[in-house]
Amino acid sequence: GKKAEVTALQAISAEDRKDWISLAFVQAGICVCVPAFLLGALLAEAMPIWPAIISGSLGYLIVVVGMVATGMIGCDLGLASCTCCQAGFGKSGARFIVSTIFAVNMIGWFGIQNGVCGEAFSNAMLAMTGWDIPVVVSNTIWGIIMLLTAVYGVHALEKLDKISIPLLMIIMCYGTFLAFKVYGTGNLNDEGTVQSMSFMSGVALSFNFTAVGTITGPDYTRFQKSRKDTVKSVFYGVFPMGVITLIMGIVLTKLSGQYDISMVLIEVGLPLLGIIALVISTWTTNSTNAYSAGLNIVMALKLKDNRRREATLISGIVGIVLCDLGILGHIEGVLSLLSYVVCPVGGVILADYWVVGKGKAKNFRPQDGVNWAGVIAWALGAIISYTLVKIEFVGIIIGFVIYLIAERFIPSASRDNAENIA
């Protein structure tokens, strides 16, 4: 086997790049998680079945477009998300704003998902065997297992996902089939559903669930060999798995009132399969949270580049401790606020690379200090999207537009380059 991956922020060399199929599995692993089923449930409760499926799928399609747009930057440069920000934000801006926010966000989500998994594991074990495993113990054990995959790196994530995604698909399909058998199809006819959400709100909700992932896409696409491979791995990784999970969430909610496949399996009398589904779906997503957190911690704390493993370990342990102390129940609100702060970062990266730098890797110029155009665009994007629009991902568009205006007054290093070469 290969040794654990060491580097964090240096460009990934040509010989370390991977084929698109292995990264499609990693992308799929990120998409299948309890929140993805929850998305289906929220849509199912707010609209009839077809609008729910179509609006949710459309949201995922926008996610794919966004991920391809940021992912190609990661692939062109071979750089992680926070490093891709060094042009639009400047090196200090990327360090103090971007990597700090990303790290907090990822560590928080690692802890929250770990808590969901730990609690469900303890409940299921109690129901199945009568053993009362304290939730703190479950959290810690599973947290460490999920964390070690991330410490090992993308190679381990890819191994995990190649085994677990097919297994999860089989369990999910079987669970849905059983739900039909147990509950019948009577509840699918939508007579009782009052449409309480507009179609476009459904699309927005679906995008919001993965908005942050759209922007941290380069953490994985930097391992791709070409733009074409990036499109393939993102599309085939995100879209089918996202939509299947969404549809199952919708159908299960309509049938049984319970959206989480693992809970449905426990209710129809297959708790063991339920636990496996829960653990795998959390593991494949959560390892990537810890992995991305580690990359950002390296930048935020200005660690040596070969300290990625230690940084990942620290991030995960902080997440597990926060989870065990029960702090995370109080900060879910804070984390949803964070997506307002993360989204405009995407707008700045996209504007600097695709418009100012004309989409060419040779024009990408990390600049020392702070690029105020990026910081202003980011801050205004976050404030406007939070106060006026109240839709997180609009921050991407606002950040993008304001950066292009601000950059006219505070030219980016990427522009001088694009002009000199042209």
Stretches found by the model and what they are:
Residues 1-50, 63, 197-203, 222-229, ...:
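Membrane-interface "cap" regions at the ends of multi-pass membrane proteins
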Residues 20-36, 177-182, 190-252, 268-287, ...:
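Hydrophobic, membrane-embedded alpha-helices of multi-pass small-molecule transporters
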Residues 309, 345-422:
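C-terminal membrane-solvent junction of multi-pass transporters and transport-like membrane proteins
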Residues 57-89, 98-108, 112, 410-416:
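Juxtamembrane transmembrane-helix boundary signature
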Residues 150, 166-192, 206-210, 249-254, ...:
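Hydrophobic alpha-helical segments and their helix-loop junctions in multi-pass secondary transporters
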Residues 42-71, 93-97, 238-239, 398:
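Extracellular loop-to-transmembrane helix junctions
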Residues 137, 141-142, 146-179, 193, ...:
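Membrane-interface loop-to-helix entry segments
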